[in-house]
Each structure stands twice: as structure tokens, then as C-alpha cells.
Curated annotation (Swiss-Prot):
Cross-referenced CDD domains: S1_IF1 (cd04451)
PROSITE patterns: S1_IF1_TYPE
Identification of the protein by name: Translation initiation factor IF-1
Provenance organism: Vibrio cholerae serotype O1 (strain ATCC 39315 / El Tor Inaba N16961)
Role according to the record: One of the essential components for the initiation of protein synthesis. Stabilizes the binding of IF-2 and IF-3 on the 30S subunit to which N-formylmethionyl-tRNA(fMet) subsequently binds. Helps modulate mRNA selection, yielding the 30S pre-initiation complex (PIC). Upon addition of the 50S ribosomal subunit IF-1, IF-2 and IF-3 are released leaving the mature 70S translation initiation complex.
Amino acid sequence: MAKEDVIEMQGTVLDTLPNTMFRVELENGHVVTAHISGKMRKNYIRILTGDKVTVEMTPYDLSKGRIVFRAR
């Protein structure tokens, strides 16, 4: 997938699911299921309920995403 095809949105973590999956509410009100990106997993960045995150989504499936950044 080319980097230009990615949609980046801000959101808030609502719930923690098994296998490092999270339910994230985006700024526009949609709720998506997201997993942690590889670099965040490698650097042991913890994500908790209520954290503000940046989610990357592909235009082909807008119900799933990848968490690429956790705001402080």
C-alpha cells in the first residue's frame, strides 16, 4: 500500500480488546477497531483507555485502522 493512500485521523481510545486491539472513537464520531503499529510495539509504548491517538486507515476498509502515535 502506498503511503499516499492512508487517511490519518485523531481519536480517543474507548476500550481495550484482546491481542493488542483497541476500540477508538474518531473525532467525527465513528468507532473503529485499531491495532498498534510495529514501531510502537517494538518500543513498548503502552496505550490505555482514554488516551488520545492518531489512527491511520486505508480507504478500502474504514472500520479498521492502525495506531501510529499516542499523544502525551
